[in-house]
């Protein structure tokens, strides 16, 4: 590390999601860290569907950046350009860096403040409570998990899930998809595969038309489909030639952007051949933090830690007590994988990784 008489190296982290928040927290005492994020908080994104049915859960999962980044600067803005040694933000801040970490993930229009985000969940929850019938569009992990949360917490609701693919959960294997489908059907969720929904033409009576010519009656809908990568702004930057044809930054085994010695990319924005999952993004963050510390210590690039793409492991929650899990050699469903993920959704661990307590009120920690 730098000697006491030396100024610390400047590390700028773009994006305060699963990856960006952890790398900023990890480096805050060894480097001069600046986190640039359009929102004032970090969110445990895989828990937001539970927060939709239980808004108070958000008190633990929506966390102000300042709660974990106590020794760094926070700029609530978006990056609009990057040069060899500076980042330019939407409000015309010019932020110099010695090391840059691009962790901008996906672009999702969310509120800027924690209070606004928690209020959003209250409104979504009220939307569910007020509806007798609900349409979920999208059968990836978000759509399946939302259907599971509503089916368990609000079993009286009529639920329909429409997915354009031939099976659910296409990012993992067909065995896991079949188990999820069977669970949804057993919990009275109507699943329509191989169809899409035209959300631009919904009748006043709540009639939705599918691409197969079917109609669905629903009082409200939730859109659970993919959102674009947060890389469009890079197309006019020095990194424009480092984007692949899908808009992902190409990185080497050290998570350095190819052709650069001081710019890292982590999380969903990378071209690493693996499923884009939060726990893997956090592994990226720890490897990158280690490598930046090594570089600040004067180590050669040959000494840097390498990242191996993650294997096809996934756990998809099915309500509060069950889940479907895919491991390298087995796929299981039910209460066993549910105990691994579904009860707490790894919230306590994720908070601990950022130096925070569980966030559970003390009265709930006591034995009954």
Language-model segments: residues:
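FAD-binding core/adjacent interface of flavoenzyme oxidoreductases
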Residues: 1-12, 70-135, 211, 222-224
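Beta1-alpha1 glycine-rich phosphate/pyrophosphate-binding loop at the start
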Residues: 2-75, 145-175
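C-terminal, flexible cofactor-proximal segment of oxidoreductases
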Residues: 6, 275, 284-368
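Short beta-strand/turn micro-motifs composed of small residues
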Residues: 15, 37, 138, 163, ...
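Glycine-rich active-site loop/strand segments that organize a redox cofactor
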Residues: 36-54, 58, 103-127, 325-326, ...
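A Rossmann-like FAD-binding core segment of flavoenzymes
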Residues: 74-77, 81-88, 95, 155-253, ...
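FAD-site-proximal beta/loop scaffold in flavoenzymes
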Residues: 114-132, 216-220, 224-286, 290, ...
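Short strand-loop-helix active-site module centered on a catalytic nucleophile
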Residues: 134-149
């Amino acid at each position: 590390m730098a000697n006491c008489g030396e100024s610390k190296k400047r590390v700028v982290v773009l994006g305060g999601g699963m990856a960006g928040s952890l790398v900023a927290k990890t480096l805050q005492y060894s480097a001069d860290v600046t986190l640039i994020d359009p929102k004032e908080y970090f969110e445990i994104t895989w828990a937001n569907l539970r927060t939709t049915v239980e808004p108070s859960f958000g008190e633990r999962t929506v966390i102000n950046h300042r709660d974990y980044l106590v020794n760094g600067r926070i700029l609530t803005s978006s990056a609009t350009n990057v040069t060899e040694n500076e980042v330019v933000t939407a409000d015309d801040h010019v932020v110099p860096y010695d090391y840059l970490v691009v962790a901008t993930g996906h672009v999702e229009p969310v509120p800027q403040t924690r209070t606004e985000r928690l209020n959003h969940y209250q409104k979504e929850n009220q939307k569910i409570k007020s509806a007798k019938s609900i349409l979920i569009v999208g059968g990836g992990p978000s759509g399946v998990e939302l259907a599971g949360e509503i089916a368990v917490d609000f079993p009286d609701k009529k639920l329909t899930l429409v997915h354009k693919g031939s099976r659910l959960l296409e990012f993992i294997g067909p065995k896991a998809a079949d188990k999820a489908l069977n669970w949804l059907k057993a919990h009275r969720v109507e699943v329509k595969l191989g169809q899409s929904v035209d959300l631009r033409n919904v009748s006043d009576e709540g009639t939705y038309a599918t691409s197969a010519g079917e109609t669905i009656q629903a009082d409200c809908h939730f859109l659970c489909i993919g959102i674009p990568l947060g890389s469009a702004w890079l197309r006019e930057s020095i990194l424009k030639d480092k984007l692949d044809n899908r808009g992902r930054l190409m990185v080497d085994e050290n998570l350095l952007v190819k052709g650069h010695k001081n710019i890292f990319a982590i999380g969903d924005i990378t071209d690493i051949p693996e499923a884009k999952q939060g726990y893997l993004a956090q592994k990226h963050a720890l490897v990158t933090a280690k490598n930046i510390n090594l570089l600040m210590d004067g180590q050669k690039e040959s000494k840097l830690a390498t990242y191996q793409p993650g294997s096809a492991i996934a756990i998809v929650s099915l309500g509060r007590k069950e889940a479907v899990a895919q491991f390298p050699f087995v796929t299981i469903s039910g209460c066993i994988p549910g105990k691994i993920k579904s009860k707490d959704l790894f919230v306590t661990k994720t908070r601990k990784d950022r130096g925070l307590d569980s966030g559970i009120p003390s009265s709930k920690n006591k034995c009954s």
